Amino acid sequence: MRRLSAAVMTLVLCLAGATGAGAHAFLERADPRVGSTVHTSPAQVRLWFTEQLEPAFSSVRVVNEGGQQVDKGDAQVDPAAPKQLRISLSPLPPGTYKVIWRVLSVDTHVTEGNFTFRVAL
């Protein structure tokens, strides 16, 4: 019985360690929301992740349907909220926009992705 308890405890500890080591910064939510239609041009895009981000190696950009960048190039991780990445936008005319992000979490794992939102004034 003791051997079984020791084996179970070892397995639990190994699994607990593996979960922490495997943590990545996944996109948790966004504003504007993923796939949404907004009726006013947003002033910025904000992205929330599941892990703290490494500011020097995290980026986001926003492009229009023609692939032209429409953000102000001022992407930054919020110092007061290290899981949030944001970027300012110029006023956007109606259309579909793609948000492209690439982040490095403080646990040194890179994740990247993209999504679209639509402006319909």
Predicted segments with their positions:
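N-terminal edge beta-strand
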Residues: 22-41
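Short strand-edge motifs at loop-to-beta-strand transitions and within beta-strands
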Residues: 83-87
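Bacterial N-terminal signal peptides that target proteins for export
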Residues: 1-8
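Extended, polar beta-sheet/loop recognition surfaces of beta-rich domains
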Residues: 40, 44-51, 108-121
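Short, surface-exposed alpha-helix to beta-strand junction/turn motifs within ectodomains of secreted
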Residues: 45-46, 51-73
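A glycine-anchored, Pro-Gly-centered beta-turn/N-cap motif
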Residues: 41, 88, 93-102
